[in-house]
Amino acid sequence: MDKDTELSRDDFLPNVLTACEYDGKLAILPQTFSLQTVIGKAEDVGTTPGWTVEDMKALLASKPEGTQLFWGMDRMSALTALMNLGYNDFINWENASCNFDSQEFIDVLDFANMFPEEFEYRDDMEDSTVLMSQGKQLLDTYYLSDFEQVQMYRAIFGGPTTFIGYPTSEGNGAMLSLNNIIGISNSCKDVDGAWQFLRTFYLPKKSSDGDSDYTYGFSIRKDDFEKYCQNAMKADSDSGSTWGWGEFEVEIQPATQEDVDQVKDLVYNTTAVSGAVSDDITNIINEEAAAYFSGQKSAEDVAEIIQSRMQVYLSETK
């Protein structure tokens, strides 16, 4: 790309390029992306994205008994949610070291253990949208790819919402979900020829409303993304149409400037990538945590075992 006369890094969202780099080089490039985050009522979680496990625990503790964070969450899914971005808090990737035997990680295990061992679905259970509207469910996982969903959640929660994100000590708690990823193999015999083909997917469109030509998500081209945001504030064929979810129906209106600013702030400040952590790492944690959740071992013992296994893994894969 750096040698291309028509395309430059300035044409693309800088945070997406950063997320696609490995060892300082652009390794892959998606065509579109969405954002994976957690949404909640601003009255509950505040207006600034980003919080910690302690913040999440404090919110739940402040609510009446029976209030739940997410719908249908059991111990393992709670641990997954807590650790979606939490790995960076316990692993030093550069030094291949970790601190899973810390009190902070033990607290994560203890918090996850507060959830039921298994989620038992019943036909008479209230819909998630009803629980959120009544304040009985505080959060929901959110895959952001358009502005219509923003309006839907605002109606469900009955007020302004915040993309609070998954708990982490740094950042906004959101992750990029990359779509239609392509790249050039190290073994490619004609890199220039391969690029001449791949570049066609990223050239500026002669006529575009900024909406993606692909299946899902926002375009990674900066001009297309900005155009899409501007057009979202204009009345179009979707304006006045009705979106339904559970017990709720919302008449879709043009996005407000506040909606656009909120989404753009999240997009431009997210560099973490969903699925970037090896399955080997998540398997180590889940396998050992199961012994604590079943009462076979203490949280402290499990944390020590995870620390030992993880350190060996990091050393071997450094």
Question: How should each PLM-predicted stretch be described?
Answer:
Residues 58-64, 113-117, 125-151, 287, ...:
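Short helices/loops that flank or line small-molecule/ion binding pockets
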Residues 2-11, 88-108, 168-173, 295:
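Short, solvent-exposed loop/beta-turn-alpha elements that line the ligand-binding surface or hinge
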Residues 25-36, 55-106, 134-142:
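Extracytoplasmic/periplasmic solute-binding protein
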Residues 43-51, 187-194:
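Short helix-loop capping/hinge motifs at secondary-structure junctions, enriched
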Residues 36-40, 182-183:
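Short glycine- and hydrophobic/aromatic-rich loop-to-beta-strand nucleating segment
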Residues 1-37, 162-167:
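Hinge/lid segment of periplasmic solute-binding proteins
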Residues 151-152, 171-176, 183-283:
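C-terminal lobe and pocket-closing loops
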Residues 94-126, 151, 161-166:
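Glycine-centered hinge/linker elements that transmit conformational signals in sensory
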